[in-house]
Each structure stands twice: as structure tokens, then as C-alpha cells.
């Protein structure tokens, strides 16, 4: 069975409590369950992780380069600032990476409109809440 790493960046551990008007009321644990269920239906193993630390995300991206068939990543605010995450994803090409955001980053503050991840991802899904993770898994499964 192919494995997809689902990586989550800073503050996503606070989902369910943090700004539910923007991010919804679902917890990250519930999103992990959704991903595992979707993965099972797609024939994919899911390795679901979260960290508030950029270096952890870089380490996991590099690990995925050796162990995974693809990555779904919600880098959180690091989307807009992290050249390190951009470079880590670039270094594991052609491993497919799908970027996910719960909110529509293009309908929010202007500093959120640019993603450092998008140029090295196969695609981005934003604005569909937790469903975005399932959509990203479906999109990756179609490419694998």
C-alpha cells in the first residue's frame, strides 16, 4: 500500500478552538480521522503529523522523499514565509505535493495571498474547510 504523508504546520493543533469563524469547528484529530478514512477508500496509507516548528516540517518532507508516494501539506502561516519548506519540497521532486488551506487565502489579508509552497506543489486546494484534505488525497491518488 502506498503511503501519503499529511503534514500540518503551526497553530493547526488549535483547530476547533482557534477562530472557528475562519477555520471551522472541526479538530485536527477529526481531520486526521477523515484523512485515514479517505485514504482507506483510496487504497492509501496515511501518516498524519503536525508541528509548530518549521524544522520538523522540513525533516518530515525529506523523510517523505524516501518513504512516501506523496504529500498533502497544510503549512499554515509558513506557506507565506518559508523558503526552507519550498526548498525541501523542491528537493524531493518529482514526489507529488498538494497544498491545502482550510480558508480561502486569496480572500483574506493580502500577506496571505502569496504561497511559497504553490510553485513547487502539483496543486493547491483552499477555502473548502476540512473537505480540502479529502479532495487533495483524491487528487494525489489519481496521480499515483
From Swiss-Prot:
GO MF annotation list: 3-dehydroquinate dehydratase activity
Keyword Lyase: yes
Domain of life where this protein originates: Bacteria
Keywords: Amino-acid biosynthesis, Aromatic amino acid biosynthesis, Lyase
Pfam families xrefs: DHquinase_II (PF01220)
CDD domains: DHQase_II
BP term (GO), one: chorismate biosynthetic process
EC number: 4.2.1.10
Residues binding substrate: 74, 80, 87, 102-103, 112
Cysteine pairings via disulfide bonds: none
Annotated site location: Transition state stabilizer: 18
Family of the protein in this entry: Belongs to the type-II 3-dehydroquinase family.
Described purpose of this protein according to its UniProt entry: Catalyzes a trans-dehydration via an enolate intermediate.
HAMAP family hit by this protein: AroQ
Protein name, entry field: 3-dehydroquinate dehydratase
Organism: Mesorhizobium japonicum (strain LMG 29417 / CECT 9101 / MAFF 303099)
Gene: aroQ
Amino acid at each position: 500500500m502506498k503511503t501519503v504523508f499529511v503534514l500540518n504546520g503551526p497553530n493547526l493543533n488549535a483547530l476547533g478552538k482557534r477562530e472557528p469563524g475562519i477555520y471551522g469547528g472541526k479538530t485536527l484529530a477529526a481531520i486526521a480521522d477523515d484523512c485515514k478514512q479517505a485514504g482507506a477508500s483510496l487504497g492509501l496509507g496515511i501518516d498524519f503529523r503536525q508541528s509548530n516548528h518549521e524544522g520538523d516540517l522540513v525533516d518530515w518532507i525529506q523523510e517523505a522523499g524516501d518513504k512516501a508516494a506523496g504529500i498533502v501539506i497544510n503549512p499554515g502561516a509558513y506557506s507565506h514565509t518559508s523558503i526552507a519548506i519550498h526548498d525541501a519540497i523542491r528537493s524531493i521532486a518529482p514526489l507529488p505535493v498538494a497544498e491545502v488551506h482550510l480558508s480561502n487565502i486569496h480572500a483574506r489579508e493580502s500577506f496571505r495571498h502569496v504561497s511559497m509552497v504553490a510553485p513547487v506543489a502539483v496543486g493547491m486546494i483552499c477555502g473548502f474547510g476540512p473537505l480540502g484534505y479529502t479532495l487533495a488525497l483524491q487528487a494525489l491518488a489519481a496521480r499515483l
